[in-house]
């Protein structure tokens, strides 16, 4: 759990107070002036029609207008190349204080420290790309149908079998979008009379899926098996609300690597608790499958957990495999159940065949079935790159969240003003960084999120470290003690090189 330094917390709250206070004051004056000069209240926000209820309004609209709009040049940045280790970022400008952003014809070649391209498959690949092109010629870009009708190609069946074999489960089912895999599957697995116990920092797709299920939802402290056991015991003893009947079923939902924390799930302990209380385990491996483990099989392999002890395994193809979509792997009984009742499978167009072929080819490379050892080298490279980059950031005095072997490493910024300053200055120095703040994180815990790739060379990483160190000094985000050495940071990095 992040402990915000007292002075940092005070200055951060003060900064938000200034933003919100002056924002409300400006809105009040705007409404007053409009009322005085027009003689009536302004038209509903989001429409030009008087008398209509506002489509856009409330605190969300206020937060966007008074905070997000000021820094929106740090988000939605268009790129003009593949998201490899380096990519082209389109330059933009604004003449109205970021209300509108205009693209230029210029691009900046930047080091990519933001994409989920963990194994480097997002770039052209000697094995994957020719097969993807061939599948495009044979099957076209879309099936134009759902799986139960005309959208079930040979490739879809092959990938389901391959995924099941890769993760160590009897069967699997595919979905066209990773977010939907969680938000649509959870309501298909559990409903009224059931209990979902969710980690407090689970992804929004899990949160929305749990809310939409109709089941009761309880939250346990992040990555805390002891508190999970307390919640389980309390809920089992109390039963369903009002009736106190036994729960129809209990599902505990956790992530393999938490995308905003970079932390590995304490899976062995959580599985032990679930087995003790006869609760199902649902594991979201969106950021861990393909990225960790000796052969890329995720946190189960990394932490020594038998996949048979995890009831439902979810993952996406958007990170390690350079494609799109997601999957659920479980027993054949569960997968058959989902194929017959899950709306996202029955009514949604199936995955694009070239996207399916990309995943098939990527997994074959990881498994060495392409006849080379490139997959093993990629897995060793991302592990080495991740641990090197994390270690150097910590030595520089940055507060870095997460665990070793995780390719996700958040750098704490805290103050809302430091977020755009850090992002803009890094981009100016040709390093593309993702910055995140409320509502994706708690209000006081704004951060930059680094994602490392196997395609990064040591020179790339050193370039990124040099820029991040300089900008960190400029913005003032080195909250921890720096290693005391006589050499400068630049000299130290040259020695490493």
Curated annotation (Swiss-Prot):
The modification N6-(pyridoxal phosphate)lysine is found at residue 319. Its cofactor is pyridoxal 5'-phosphate. It is an enzyme of class 2 (transferase). The chain crosses the membrane at residues 4-24. Keywords: Acyltransferase, Endoplasmic reticulum, Lipid metabolism, Membrane, Pyridoxal phosphate, Sphingolipid metabolism, Transferase, Transmembrane, Transmembrane helix. CDD domains: KBL_like. GO terms for biological process: ceramide biosynthetic process; sphingosine biosynthetic process. Heterodimer with LCB1. Component of the serine palmitoyltransferase (SPT) complex, composed of LCB1 and LCB2. Serine palmitoyltransferase (SPT). The heterodimer formed with LCB1 constitutes the catalytic core. This is Long chain base biosynthesis protein 2c.
């Amino acid at each position: 759990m992040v402990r915000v330094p007292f002075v940092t917390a005070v200055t951060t709250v003060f900064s938000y107070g200034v933003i919100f206070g002056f924002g409300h004051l400006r809105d009040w004056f705007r409404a007053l002036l409009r009322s005085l000069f027009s003689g009536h209240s302004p038209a509903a926000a989001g429409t030009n029609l008087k008398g209509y209820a506002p489509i856009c309004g409330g605190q969300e609209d206020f937060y966007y207008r008074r905070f997000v709009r000021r820094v929106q040049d740090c988000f939605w940045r268009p790129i003009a190349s593949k998201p490899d280790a380096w990519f082209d970022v389109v330059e933009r400008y604004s003449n109205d204080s970021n209300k509108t952003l205009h693209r230029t014809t210029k691009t900046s070649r930047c080091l990519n420290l933001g994409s989920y391209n963990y194994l480097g498959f997002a770039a052209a690949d000697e094995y994957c790309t020719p097969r993807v092109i061939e599948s495009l010629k044979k099957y076209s870009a879309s099936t134009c149908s759902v799986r139960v009708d005309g959208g079930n190609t040979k490739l879809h069946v092959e990938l389901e079998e391959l995924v099941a074999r890769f993760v160590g489960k009897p069967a699997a089912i595919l979905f066209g979008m990773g977010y939907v895999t969680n938000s649509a599957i959870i309501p298909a697995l559990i409903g009224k009379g059931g209990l979902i116990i969710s980690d407090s920092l689970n992804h929004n797709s899990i949160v929305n899926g749990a809310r939409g299920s109709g089941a009761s939802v309880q939250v346990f402290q992040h990555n805390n098996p002891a508190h999970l056991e307390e919640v389980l015991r309390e809920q089992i003893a109390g039963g369903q609300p009002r009736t106190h009947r036994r729960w129809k079923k209990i599902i505990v939902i956790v992530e393999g690597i938490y995308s905003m924390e970079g932390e590995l799930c304490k899976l062995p302990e959580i599985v032990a608790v679930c087995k003790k209380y006869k609760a199902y385990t649902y594991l979201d491996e969106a950021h861990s499958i393909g990225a960790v483990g000796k052969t890329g099989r995720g946190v189960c392999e990394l932490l020594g957990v038998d996949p048979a002890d995890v009831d439902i395994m979810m993952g996406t193809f958007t990170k390690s495999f350079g494609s799109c979509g997601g999957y659920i792997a479980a027993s054949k009984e569960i997968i058959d159940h989902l194929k017959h009742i899950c709306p996202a499978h029955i009514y949604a167009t199936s995955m694009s065949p070239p996207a399916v072929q990309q995943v098939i080819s990527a997994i074959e490379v990881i498994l060495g079935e392409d006849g080379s050892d490139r997959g093993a080298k990629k897995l060793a490279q991302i592990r080495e790159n991740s641990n090197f980059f994390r270690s150097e950031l910590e030595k520089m005095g940055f507060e870095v969240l997460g665990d070793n072997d995780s390719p996700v490493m958040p750098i704490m910024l805290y103050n809302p003003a430091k977020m755009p300053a850090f992002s803009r200055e890094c981009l100016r120095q040709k390093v593309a960084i993702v910055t995140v703040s409320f509502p994706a994180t708690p209000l006081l815990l704004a951060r930059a999120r680094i994602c490392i790739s196997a395609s990064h060379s040591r020179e790339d990483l050193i370039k990124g470290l040099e820029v991040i160190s300089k900008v960190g000094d400029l913005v003032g985000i080195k909250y921890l003690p720096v290693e005391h050495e006589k050499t400068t940071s630049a000299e130290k990095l040259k020695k490493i090189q």
